[in-house]
Amino acid sequence: MKTMILLGEGYEEVEAITVIDYLRRAQIPIDIVSINETLSTIGDHGIEIMADKLLDDIDTDSYDMVITPGGRPGAEKLAKDKRVTDLIAQQVARDKYVSSICASPIALEAAGITKDLEGTCYPGFEDQVHYKTFHEDITYYDENHKVLTSRGPATAVYFALDIIRILKGDAKAQEVADGLLLPIVEEKKG
């Protein structure tokens, strides 16, 4: 399974880095793809990530999953970029995976796919993302459409683990969670 995470200026760094790191721990290939004209991308809090590739330079058909992080400015850029919204619509039409967190489901809305979806998003964006059914879950996976959504920065851990679970199964997701000491943290937090 080959994945990409799309970064435009103003993405939420926690959501991007968590997904990239966890997928690499799970040995799931993930390309960091810039929607800019350069590989340099700057997050909402001024952190620079150098992308692996430019969106214009890749064969998007070769990817099994497209991932979009939130951060209001970054999500708005994704939603306004026709290359991105066309890619998201094509992924769903081809029965491939899409995963969006925080504000980035507005790109799903812009792609015209939310009317049939069940999902979630960052609080306050419900009026911009018109799901068939909205869920307040930490993450929500619409199995019929292969679309995973999540709420925001604090849910990025669970979002990334759910991506692993979807692509590589429960055992691999648990292995990564165990290595991160997540079960111990959850037990102590009670």
Describe the function of each predicted region.
Residues L39-H45:
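Membrane-interfacial amphipathic helices and adjacent loop/beta segments
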Residues I17, S34-N36:
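Short glycine/proline-centered loop/turn elements that form peptide/ligand docking sites
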Residues T18-R25:
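Short, solvent-exposed amphipathic alpha-helices that sit
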Residues A16-T18, C121:
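Hydrophobic side chains within alpha-helical segments
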Residues H45-K53:
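Short gly/ser/thr-rich secondary-structure transition/capping motifs
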Residues M4-I5, Y11, A26-S34, D52-L54, ...:
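Active-site-adjacent pocket-lining segments in enzyme domains
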